[in-house]
């Protein structure tokens, strides 16, 4: 018997300001403040012949405050567009755990991202190049704090062979910080055999992402070919270890995770008096999950097909698709 109850309150305030300045300049300011109150309850009991064998109660009552502020500056030149910005995120969390196991955690986390980029065009080539630096900081009450700096370049190139054919490639390096819930140094009983344990020693990791896209159109026919690759060394993923005849589910910086994905979309339309459009997509995802104590691979083939009809002010659509599965960790 395992009833669960969860409630969340999430009020937020979003302030946005944009101003056009002389000499083709633009200034954008954005600030978001959010408060999240969460109450989660889980009760797990095991009975045999009307005899209570185990009774596990877990309650989490938490408050999280966050402020996200960002400033963006852009200026248009004859050769292209120059932009830059600063984004800062600050979070405070206070969680109280009660039931079979009790405790309290107070955590602070911040991330600052400073970046600049330039976009331009040379004949048939559109390009964007940017660089950025991010700083991640975390402090849990009773533990040492940490901070990490990450260099984050990105590039985007698109070559237009004709008005109906182009090739585009994007590449970027992103910083991923652990969530406050993953960093919590608290154990929670799931049932009589499983325990979920936080890890205050998690470190941010980098994600190297690349995407390529080729599109060709001729008349009513369109072909769209996509390829995606992501590589995350030291990615934070779950693993299961055994201690004192219990299975401990923890997250840790594992060896790495990779995803390779490719798909082809064929579209025809509009046909039959310019009313009907058809689209078919087929693709595959391959996942490689390398843990400190495990190694797994998984392939997911998927498809998607749709028919759309448009007549005057009316539109109807039918779509069917298979599961688009993901695989991370164990």
Question: Which residues are covered by each model-predicted region?
Answer:
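Face-selective signature of the C-terminal outer-membrane beta-barrel domain
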Residues: 2-143, 160, 221-227, 258-286, ...
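Outer-membrane beta-barrel translocator domains and adjoining extracellular loop/strand segments
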Residues: 1-2, 39-50, 94-103, 139-148, ...
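Outer-membrane beta-barrel signature, preferentially recognizing the C-terminal barrel domain
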Residues: 175-224, 231, 249-261, 269-271
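A conserved cytosolic signaling coiled-coil/coupling helix that links sensory/transmembrane modules
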Residues: 117, 162, 166-169, 174, ...
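Gram-negative outer-membrane beta-barrel transporters
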Residues: 229-231, 253-325
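Active/binding-pocket-proximal capping segment
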Residues: 132-134, 172-176, 186-188, 230, ...
């Amino acid at each position: 018997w395992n009833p669960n109850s969860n409630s969340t309150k999430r009020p937020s305030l979003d302030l946005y300001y944009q101003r056009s300045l002389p000499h083709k300049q633009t200034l954008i300011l954005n600030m978001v403040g959010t408060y999240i109150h969460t109450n989660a309850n889980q009760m797990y009991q095991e009975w045999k012949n009307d005899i209570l064998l185990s009774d596990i109660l877990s309650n989490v009552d938490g408050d999280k405050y966050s402020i996200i502020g960002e400033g963006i500056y852009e200026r248009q030149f004859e050769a292209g567009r120059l932009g830059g910005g600063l984004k800062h995120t600050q979070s405070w969390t206070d969680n109280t755990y009660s039931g079979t196991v009790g405790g309290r955690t107070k955590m602070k986390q911040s991330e600052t991202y400073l970046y600049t980029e330039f976009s331009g065009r040379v004949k048939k080539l559109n390009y964007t190049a940017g660089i950025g630096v991010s700083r991640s900081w975390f402090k849990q009450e009773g533990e040492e704090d940490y901070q990490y700096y990450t260099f984050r370049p990105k590039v985007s190139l698109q070559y237009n062979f004709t008005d109906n054919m182009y090739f585009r490639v994007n590449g970027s390096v992103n910083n991923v910080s652990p969530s406050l819930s993953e960093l919590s140094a608290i154990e929670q009983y799931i049932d009589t055999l499983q325990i979920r344990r936080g890890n205050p020693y998690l470190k941010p990791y980098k994600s190297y992402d690349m995407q390529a896209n080729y599109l060709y159109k001729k008349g009513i026919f369109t072909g769209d070919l996509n390829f995606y690759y992501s590589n995350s060394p030291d990615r934070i993923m779950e693993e299961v270890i055994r201690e004192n005849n219990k299975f401990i589910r923890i997250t840790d910086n594992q060896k790495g995770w990779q995803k390779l994905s490719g798909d082809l979309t064929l579209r025809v339309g509009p046909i039959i008096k310019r009313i009907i459009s058809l689209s078919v997509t087929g693709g595959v995802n391959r996942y490689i999950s390398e843990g400190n104590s495990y190694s797994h691979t998984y392939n997911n083939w998927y498809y998607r097909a749709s028919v759309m009809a448009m007549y005057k002010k009316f539109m109807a659509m039918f779509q069917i698709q298979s599961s688009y599965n993901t695989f991370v960790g164990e």
